Amino acid sequence: MTISRDKTPASPTAKWLTVVGIGADGLAGLSDRARAAIAGADHVFGGTRHLALAARLIEGAAVPWPSPFDPGMAAVLARRGQPVCVLASGDPMWHGVGVTLARHVAADEMVVIPAPSAFSLAAARLTWPLAEVATLSLHGRALAHLWPHLAPGRKLLALTSDGAGPAAIANYLTALGLGHATLTVLEDLGGPAERVRQRPAANFDLGSVHDLNLVAIEFTTAATAAILPAAPGLPDDWFAHDGQLTKRELRALTLSALHPTAGQRLWD
């Protein structure tokens, strides 16, 4: 299904859409403004977990997100001008549904009421300065997205898709030669089943992990690990090739001279 990206407002004053961030603590963490938005909506869209958390406040129709997601987005946009509420995890504008909605709905049509993000809660539990931490969502994404963020001394917070995610991260890091990396698994942050556990990647024996989890990664040395360098010139043996490969030194000099920026591509 194709979704229109038209952001023409329904009327000059209509803020018909409210996106409410809700944490694992449910109603207890909601402001009066958020509660009023949920109770006053004709339709409340959200995941089944979010709808269950807010069930006592919902007076209109509770609409679970379908799979795939696009028909649900189309259903929200079809109600333009009506009071609609969308429930999201934590901060809707941080790897959340609010980002997708903002591509289709003008800022003067919507209100976003965030809750603390999983990253904020994790940084608080670990007392890590969030401004100095790399953050990444692996929800529905390959583990290879971790690779560019891995560096000695760098702290990384990775949001996973489910309870199998932390063990998969541990195996991936071990395969890169980072079995000594410390993994801290933070589960159900802000909820009744909150738990924080720590293991080295090579000896990851936590067993069952809550589906709502985030993994903190840190290591100080990586002498023999496959870490992406910050400067151009990747090792020759990192490429699949038939022997016809521009040598590392020439690649490094060429890239340095061209100084490419994000989004540019050189075909050698």
Where are these regions (language model features)?
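A contiguous loop/helix-start segment that scaffolds small-molecule binding in enzyme catalytic cores
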Residues: 2-19, 32, 82-84, 152-244
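A short alpha->loop->secondary-structure connector
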Residues: 103-110, 127-132, 176-181
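Conserved alpha-helix/loop element of class I SAM-dependent methyltransferases that forms part
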Residues: 245-262
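Conserved class I S-adenosyl-L-methionine
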Residues: 263-268
